[in-house]
From Swiss-Prot:
Domain notes per entry: The PTS EIIB type-2 domain is phosphorylated by phospho-EIIA on a cysteinyl residue. Then, it transfers the phosphoryl group to the sugar substrate concomitantly with the sugar uptake processed by the PTS EIIC type-2 domain.
Family matches, as SUPFAM superfamilies: PTS system IIB component-like
GO cellular component, one term: cytoplasm
Primary localization class, coarse: cytoplasm
Highest taxon listed in the record's lineage: Bacteria
Protein name: Ascorbate-specific PTS system EIIB component
Phosphocysteine, modified sites: 9
PTS EIIB type-2 domain: residues covered: 3-96
Active site: 9
Keyword Secreted: no
UniProt-annotated location(s): Cytoplasm
Family annotation (NCBIfam families): PRK10222.1 (NF007586)
Amino acid sequence: MTVRILAVCGNGQGSSMIMKMKVDQFLTQSNIDHTVNSCAVGEYKSELSGADIIIASTHIAGEITVTGNKYVVGVRNMLSPADFGPKLLEVIKAHFPQDVK
């Protein structure tokens, strides 16, 4: 199985696209089987079926509601692996250990 990440920002254009690339690079270096997509906060509900973990800035993360085996990771600096990396790895190792190589 591959853990599916959805990067969410206010407009779905700038920050989430850059965050998508940063998360992809970080998870590749961390040997995690993954896919990463991005969207605007207003579109996340239509993207939920294809996501296991939603990553967003802390002020947007509060607007995101998920149920079941889906998780929201709120981060202060979306572009810094030092900020989002440990939080993302904690969720992946706890809930998706089969994706850690």
